Swiss-Prot record:
The keyword rRNA processing does not apply. This is Formyl-CoA:oxalate CoA-transferase. It catalyses: formyl-CoA + oxalate = oxalyl-CoA + formate. It is an enzyme of class 2 (transferase). Involved in the catabolism of oxalate and in the adapatation to low pH via the induction of the oxalate-dependent acid tolerance response (ATR). Catalyzes the transfer of the CoA moiety from formyl-CoA to oxalate. Substrate binds at G247, G248, Q249. Homodimer. CoA binds at residues 17-18, 38, 72-75, 96-98, 104, 136-139. Signal peptide: none annotated. One of its GO terms (biological process) is oxalate catabolic process. The lineage of its organism: Bacteria, Pseudomonadati, Pseudomonadota, Alphaproteobacteria, Hyphomicrobiales.
Length: 425
């Protein structure tokens, strides 16, 4: 079966997380992704957070599936020759270097267009044009500058970053969409274009409901926030709201049976208006169905702490899975707090390919996330990440058409590895 992106060749100059997230998604959809790495060391994440000495880390392997690796010293004249040839034959170049790095390598946008007018150049940067565009950005910096940290946490506590990598992986996913869109437009124009995704922009895009709330503040308090019911005045910026729901339907994380020993024995419950009477039945407060202080959503807004405390009295008598089963039977929105251990052992996620087991030649079998996007006519087969430079000769021969003698010349120049030592006669 053909893949959705069969025939698309991607030159992958990315490293760490944001860029590799993007190129891995393209590879999962069938693109031929050629990862360009520094001879001798490669992507820095190969050696970061290693759990097994002298073996590619999970940090690297889980972000670089389905790719081919070529080692290339782009400062070496022969290395630059190879890179130029790759630009000529590839469809997309993806990079997440610091500002200006690609230009200093001698490959400006204008130069790339001269080599291959159909080339799409996709870049991840920390910030878009403006006062901060030259600043270096990592995951937590992006969360802090994109509005996530200021709106995450509890009102009286510090701003918090999330466990989800919305800055790195989130921006990588945005860039992948931009690349596919540019490829589609190229069918009509015949030309490549630049595609840029800034990490600050990506985080802010995912925080759009908080930008919504910022504007709502101009017209009065945010009544679904718990501080409204507590009589605490709002300031001029969206506050941190703990675990209050961001969708306008009040919700909280509540304790379940065993919470004293299990840090994840909790469930999230939403008091959605259409199922309010069913909630009252479940928790044994049938009088609340008609009581003027509880019967309508506006009346309940000032009593959310009391209401959720009562619901929690009920959830504490059930395990999180028991509570979920009972609530789901009445279409009451809820979800257990699942630990990474529980997710890793969830057989339904294995069955759908959301979690996959991958076999690696040096580290053995490990678990990874699979493709979260399922295409009926282009199923994803997750293949292991490449060893450093594993496909160098294959790419030189099969992609660029180099002869054995030309490949040997490239190697001897030191463009792909230190020059070979001559054997003593």
């Amino acid at each position: 079966m053909t893949k959705a992106l069969d025939g698309v060749r991607v030159l992958d100059f990315t490293h760490v997380q944001s860029g590799p997230t993007c190129t891995q998604l393209l590879a999962w959809f069938g693109a031929d992704v050629i990862k360009v790495e520094r001879p001798g060391s490669g992507d820095i994440t190969r050696g970061q957070l290693q759990d097994i000495p002298k073996v590619d880390s999970l940090y690297f392997t889980m972000l670089n599936h389905n790719k081919r690796s070529i080692t290339l010293d782009t400062k070496n004249p022969k290395g630059k020759e190879v890179l130029t040839a790759l630009i000529r034959t590839c469809d997309v170049l993806v990079e997440n270097f610091g500002p200006g790095v690609l230009d200093r390598m001698g490959f400006t946008w204008e130069k790339i267009q001269e080599i291959n007018p159909r080339m799409i150049v996709a870049s991840i940067k920390g910030f878009g044009p403006g006062p901060y565009e030259d600043c270096k950005v990592y995951e937590n910096v992006a969360q802090c500058t994109g509005g996530a940290a200021s709106t995450t946490g509890f009102r009286e506590g510090l701003p918090l970053v999330t466990g989800a990598q919305i800055g790195d992986s989130g921006t990588g996913l945005h860039l992948a969409l931009g690349i596919v869109t540019a490829l589609y437009q190229r069918h009509h124009t015949g030309r490549g274009q630049r595609v840029t995704a800034a990490m600050q922009d990506g985080v802010l895009n995912l925080c759009r409901v908080k930008l919504r709330d910022q504007q709502r503040l101009d017209h009065g308090p945010l009544k679904e926030y718990s501080q409204f019911g507590e009589g605490i005045p709002f300031g001029d910026a969206v506050p941190r709201a703990g675990n209050d729901s961001g969708g306008g339907q009040p919700g909280r994380i509540l304790k379940c049976k065993g919470w004293e020993q299990d840090p994840n024995a909790y469930i999230y419950v939403i008091t959605q208006a259409p199922v309010w009477e069913k909630i009252c039945d479940v928790i044994g407060e049938t009088g609340w169905k008609t009581h003027p202080d509880y019967a309508t959503p506006p009346a309940r807004l000032s009593r959310l702490n009391e209401i959720f405390a009562r619901i929690e009295q009920w959830t504490m008598t059930k395990t999180k899975f028991e509570a979920m089963e009972i609530l789901n039977a009445d279409d009451i929105p809820c979800g257990p707090i699942l630990s990474m251990k529980e997710l890793a052992e969830d057989q339904s996620l294995r069955a759908t390919g959301t979690i996959v087991e991958v076999d690696h030649p040096t580290r053995g079998k490990y678990l990874s996330v699979g493709n979260p996007i399922k295409l009926s006519d282009s199923p994803t087969e997750v293949k292991r990440s490449p060893l450093l430079g594993e496909h160098t000769d294959e790419i030189l021969r099969d992609v660029l058409g180099y002869s054995d003698a030309h490949v040997a010349e490239i190697h001897d120049s030191g463009a792909t590895a230190p020059p070979r030592k001559q054997a003593a006669e």
